[in-house]
Amino acid sequence: MKIGFIGLGNMAQAMIGGVLRNHLAVPEEIYGSAKTAETESKVHEMFGITVTGDNLETARQAELLILAVKPQFLEKVIGQISDIDLTGKTILSIAAGKSLAWLEEQFCAPLPFVRAMPNTPALVGEGCTGVCYGSRVTPEMKEKTAAVLDSFGKTVELPEHLMDVLTGVSGCAPAWIFMLIEAMADGAVAKGMPRSQAYECCLLYTSPSPRDRTRS
């Protein structure tokens, strides 16, 4: 399957890494474009994917087109690519707050749309991603898209009205927990404990079973 990424920031890099680690595609089947040539060069060096330098070309090449840009830039990106023939392509957006209906309105076309919300632990392959599928996504593409999302963590399929709820739980909560751990460690360091030990004592250790989790 050919996969295209418009936007090659941290989340796109996490997704590309997961796809390659799980052998869902080879680098030659992954296309990408970014706002700057520096980002494209960096991602090409990291993963060996094809960088196009052109959102239109990325869209043309992809079977699964992933819109990995921030919400404030999404409308502009869609405007750049919506006039080409996107028949047969599945469009996956990871922009927060942009509904399936909004995507269809912007593209002015009845395409297969997917909305997903990954979180920052995806950067280390431990993400929790909420996903909802539009009615035009075929079972085959749903399976392939789910495999991509599963490649960097756990995926939870939800009705769309719960996507914003998920954002509050899994999108923001990891950052809050990281800040709490940092603050606890800072307190221990202030009392003379080495930072490495402070972090170790603050972290939650996780076994294969959530029931076996213990705090150290």
Where are the language model's segments positioned?
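A structural micro-motif
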Residues: 1, 28, 49, 89, ...
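NAD(P)+-binding Rossmann beta1-loop-alpha1 motif at the extreme N-terminus of oxidoreductases
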Residues: 1-46, 51-53, 126-127, 189-191
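Short, well-ordered alpha-helices that flank and scaffold nucleotide-derived cofactor binding pockets
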Residues: 13, 17, 21, 45, ...
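Small-residue helix-packing motif on alpha-helices
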Residues: 30, 40, 58, 194-202
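Rossmann-like NAD(P)(H) cofactor-binding subdomain of soluble oxidoreductases
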Residues: 37, 46-47, 55-60, 64-131
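Internal alpha-helical scaffold of NAD(P)-dependent oxidoreductase catalytic cores
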Residues: 102-112, 128-165, 177-207
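Aromatic-residue-lined binding/catalytic grooves and analogous aromatic/hydrophobic interfacial grooves
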Residues: 173
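Single conserved hydrophobic/aromatic residue that forms the stacking wall/gate
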Residues: 208-216
